[in-house]
Amino acid sequence: MHCPFCRHPDSRVVDSREADEGQAIRRRRSCPECGRRFTTVETAVLSVVKRSGVTEPFSREKVVRGVRRACQGRQVDNDALNLLAQQVEDAVRASGSAEIPSNEVGLAILGPLRDLDEVAYLRFASVYRSFSSAEDFAREIKELREHRESRDDA
């Protein structure tokens, strides 16, 4: 790690701690050349592999934008959308893979969205799963009802 002050090519780690609920490592470093201290934050890069094969960094904002479209006209606030995006990122990171297929991101969205707002869930699922008929909607509504009943019974 280069020193940001004198550009010396080496530094010594003085202290390491977890940050962002274990998603990052915060390190205090000391430069052997100039003696100044600085902090670095290290995170594992999470990449999404799209259907076309193109790889791009995971973006919580992209998750929020996609879910916000499904929530238009619904009583869902930004805090709830941000929490959902965090849950999706946590679920995707829990897979342990640095590269995750885009369809797995979509699957990770469906569960928290179903619990957040059923109408928004149906809208998102209809696009994500390419519903082509009223039967597709009816099947999904039936599954929603079964999920709600099993959740209420528990």
Curated annotation (Swiss-Prot):
Which InterPro entries does the UniProt entry name for this protein? ATP-cone_dom (IPR005144), NrdR-like_N (IPR055173), RNR_NrdR-like (IPR003796)
Q: Which domain of life is it from?
A: Bacteria
Q: Which cofactor does it need?
A: Zn(2+)
Q: Does the keyword Transcription apply?
A: yes
Alphabetically sorted, this entry's keywords are:
ATP-binding, DNA-binding, Metal-binding, Nucleotide-binding, Repressor, Transcription, Transcription regulation, Zinc, Zinc-finger
DNA-binding among keywords: yes
Q: Which GO terms describe its molecular function?
A: ATP binding; DNA binding; zinc ion binding
Q: List the disulfide bonds.
A: none
Q: Where are the zinc fingers (unnamed)?
A: 3-34
GO terms, biological process:
negative regulation of DNA-templated transcription
Q: How is the cofactor bound?
A: Binds 1 zinc ion.
Location of the ATP-cone domain: 46-136
Job description of the protein: Negatively regulates transcription of bacterial ribonucleotide reductase nrd genes and operons by binding to NrdR-boxes.
Output the PANTHER family linked to this UniProt entry.
Answer: TRANSCRIPTIONAL REPRESSOR NRDR
Q: What protein family is recorded?
A: Belongs to the NrdR family.
Specify the protein name. Transcriptional repressor NrdR
The coding gene here is nrdR
